Amino acid sequence: MATRARGFSLLRGRLGRGPVRAPGVAERAWRGFGSSGRRHEAVIISGTNMAKQIQKEIQQGVESWIALGNRRPHLSIILVGDNPASHTYVRNKIKAASAVGICSELIIKPKNVSQEELLDITDQLNMDPRVSGILVQLPLPDHVDERTICNGIAPEKDVDGFHIINIGRLCLDQHSLIPATASAVWEIIKRAGIETFGKNVVVAGRSKNVGMPIAMLLHTDGEHERPGGDATVTIAHRYTPREQLKAHTQLADIIIVAAGIPRLITADMVREGAAVIDVGINYIQDPVTGKTKLVGDVDFEAVKKKASFITPVPGGVGPMTVAMLLKNTLLAAKNIAY
């Protein structure tokens, strides 16, 4: 007796379910060429505005949690050395935490701090019942192994989502504390109403803290314990030949760029109507003013004329990453990430 191929029978059932569309931004989506024949520019997704809405939701969650008689969520941040960018990032995180009602403390150590001392600090914070979440600001000095330090944080307090257990659970489609930047990208896609079901996605970037988790979230079965995007995902990186990368991106419905290369993605690499999420953070010298400015991995001005959705840099994924870090802190306080 013939047996129907299981994969195809499941596919038919899943196709009947279809994609879930989020309300809001999608209703104003780019429609290619209008009746006038004029091309519409992309919807520019403001991560700043989206993050403000999420922070309001987190603030309400914190207040409700405290009203039930629970301890206020507490975030401990460890900062090593005097990297100006790291200090700026940490100040922003502390300010945002305060705004939503999360307590925070900053532990600053010199750049010559030993790995053993950092592990002692994380051990103390792990055992402290007042501490809901722990974050070690990266990068760390060369003599300190970042993976060892990240794994020294208790998984249930690892609000960055970098612990090997959290990464492992993410890859197995199980509930976990998800890396904040990957979570930010996923939240942007969902809230903007960008369809992922059955779509082709290119993730340019293979880091285990950003690119890989993004790919995991997008390709996961939407009916698993930790639902994903049901997309077909291709992962590229800084050493993917440009023509090969272009061949992939020209077929992509969604392009997510986290390679750390200014203007890696140009307009000729993007198909009409693709959604483009720029995770890049690059400081370059402005050829006109001579001043340093922040840019992403996408040629924003050119690509926005072809894309359906696009995130700017700054003001896109960055603010959302901070918001998702705060969300992880609240989840850790409630101990409901698993």
Curated annotation (Swiss-Prot):
GO annotation (BP), single: purine nucleotide biosynthetic process
Tissue occurrence: Widely expressed.
Membrane recorded as keyword: yes
Catalytic activity: (6R)-5,10-methylene-5,6,7,8-tetrahydrofolate + NAD(+) = (6R)-5,10-methenyltetrahydrofolate + NADH; (6R)-5,10-methenyltetrahydrofolate + H2O = (6R)-10-formyltetrahydrofolate + H(+); (6R)-5,10-methylene-5,6,7,8-tetrahydrofolate + NADP(+) = (6R)-5,10-methenyltetrahydrofolate + NADPH
Pfam families: THF_DHG_CYH (PF00763), THF_DHG_CYH_C (PF02882)
Cofactor(s) annotated in UniProt: Mg(2+)
InterPro entries: Aminoacid_DH-like_N_sf, NAD(P)-bd_dom_sf, THF_DH/CycHdrlase, THF_DH/CycHdrlase_cat_dom, THF_DH/CycHdrlase_CS, THF_DH/CycHdrlase_NAD-bd_dom
Binding site for substrate: 89-93, 136-138, 314-318
Protein keywords: Amino-acid biosynthesis, Histidine biosynthesis, Hydrolase, Magnesium, Membrane, Methionine biosynthesis, Mitochondrion, Mitochondrion inner membrane, Multifunctional enzyme, NAD, One-carbon metabolism, Oxidoreductase, Purine biosynthesis
Positions of NAD(+) binding: 205-207, 238
Biological or metabolic pathway of the protein: One-carbon metabolism; tetrahydrofolate interconversion
Tagged with keyword Ligase: no
Gene3D superfamilies documented for this protein: Leucine Dehydrogenase, chain A, domain 1, NAD(P)-binding Rossmann-like Domain
PROSITE patterns, alphabetized: THF_DHG_CYH_2
Membrane topology category: Peripheral membrane protein
SUPFAM superfamilies per the UniProt record, alphabetical: Aminoacid dehydrogenase-like, N-terminal domain, NAD(P)-binding Rossmann-fold domains
Localization in the cell: Mitochondrion inner membrane
Enzyme Commission number: 1.5.1.15, 1.5.1.5, 3.5.4.9
GO cellular component: mitochondrial inner membrane; mitochondrial matrix
Gene Ontology molecular function, alphabetical: methenyltetrahydrofolate cyclohydrolase activity; methylenetetrahydrofolate dehydrogenase (NAD+) activity; methylenetetrahydrofolate dehydrogenase (NADP+) activity
Similarity annotation: Belongs to the tetrahydrofolate dehydrogenase/cyclohydrolase family.
Function comment: Bifunctional mitochondrial folate-interconverting enzyme that has both NAD/NADP-dependent methylenetetrahydrofolate dehydrogenase and methenyltetrahydrofolate cyclohydrolase activities.
Protein name: Bifunctional methylenetetrahydrofolate dehydrogenase/cyclohydrolase 2, mitochondrial
Species of the source: Mus musculus
Source taxonomy: Eukaryota, Metazoa, Chordata, Craniata, Vertebrata
Chain's gene name: Mthfd2l
